[in-house]
Design a protein with these regions (language model features):
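Ligand-binding clefts/hinges and TM-proximal coupling segments of bilobed small-molecule sensing domains
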Residues: 31, 81-84, 162-185, 258-286
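Extracytoplasmic small-molecule ligand-binding "clamshell" domains
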Residues: 34-109
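Bilobed "Venus flytrap"/periplasmic-binding protein-like clamshell domains
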Residues: 45, 49-52, 64-76, 132-191, ...
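Acidic, polar ligand-binding/catalytic clefts
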Residues: 84-150, 232-234
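Short helix-initiation/N-cap motifs at beta->coil->alpha
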Residues: 84-95, 183-200, 212
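A ligand-binding cleft/hinge motif common to bilobed small-molecule-binding domains
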Residues: 92, 98, 108-118, 168-171, ...
């Protein structure tokens, strides 16, 4: 019997087995039941690293923001989990939660039908963002809301159908069949174009998230601050924002729901809204 040949065969078998185990391990998602030293399930909370005041990294290099703060309060309510916060980009968050790299993600997300196919949405929202119209200042005395905008002209900058803002105008039109906004679809364009089209009179309004308007125009260091003296913003309503969970994390989403309901009843959510926004954005959901 050739001992050398047997040894090589055995070694090859061991390597194959080790490789199979390694591949099996790689097939498991990061959201699958990792345990800490004390037996708690580790959950990774991805959040955007720039979206002040919702989700960002502060000057001390720490995860911060309203939604991050809420999730940290949720963590206190759920001692069976160990929360790890990971600041990242928009794309990595969305892809990572879908693939299981992250357990849950927060980035001021609205519900859409397309997103519901990829993620678990909890029953309870985490917060809200305000949506409204960027208009010319010379029309501000006539345009006070969507109804008066529709009466004025209804000429709104086109919106891509997959954009959650399209749904906002579509719902308004369904509720107001006799006072429609001229909703047309478009592909993506630069936000500077939208503001320019409104200023030129090509359209009379651009549906914009208030925070985006502030960051793009209202702030002194905003990239399009030169438009500030010619444009105005009209609030419409609040849109609920949600954390998104990996599809395998329904149980964790259910636990989140219980915790968030307790926090809301205790007034903690309202307290954090005042801290980060200076007002209750939840009031705009009513």
């Amino acid at each position: 019997m050739n001992l050398k040949k047997i040894t090589k065969t055995a070694l090859a078998g061991l390597l194959a087995a080790a490789l199979a185990v390694g591949l099996a391990g790689c097939g498991k998602s990061g959201a699958d039941s990792a345990k800490s030293a004390d037996g708690k399930k580790i959950v990774t909370v991805a959040h955007t690293n720039y979206y002040v005041p919702y989700d960002y990294v502060n000057e001390q290099g720490e995860s911060d923001g309203f939604e991050v703060a809420v999730m940290k309060e949720v963590a206190k309510k759920l001692p069976q989990y160990e929360f790890k916060f990971v600041p990242t980009s928009d794309d990595d968050l969305l892809i990572g939660v879908e693939s299981g790299k992250y357990t849950v993600g927060t980035k001021g997300i609205w519900i859409t039908d397309a997103r519901k196919k990829k993620y678990v949405f909890p029953k309870n929202n985490i917060g809200a963002s305000v949506i409204g119209l960027a208009i010319r200042k010379d029309t501000a005395d006539k345009i006070k809301d969507l109804k008066t905008f529709a009466q004025f002209s209804g000429k709104i900058v086109p919106i891509a159908p997959q954009d959650a803002r399209y749904m906002v105008i579509d719902e308004y039109n369904k509720e107001n069949p006799d006072n429609q906004i001229k909703l047309t679809s478009s592909e993506a364009f630069q936000v500077a174009d939208a503001y320019s089209w409104v200023l030129e009179g090509r359209y009379d309004g651009y549906l914009d998230v208030e925070l985006s308007y502030k960051n793009n125009i209202a702030k002194e260091d905003a990239p399009y601050h030169q438009f500030d003296d010619k444009m105005a913003y009209v609030r419409y309503k609040g849109i609920p924002t949600y954390p998104i969970f990996n599809k395998k994390e329904q149980a964790f989403a259910d636990d989140y729901d219980k915790a968030i309901e307790e926090l809301r009843a205790e007034g903690k959510i309202a307290e954090l809204e005042q801290k980060y926004f200076g007002e209750s954005l939840s009031d705009y959901l009513k």
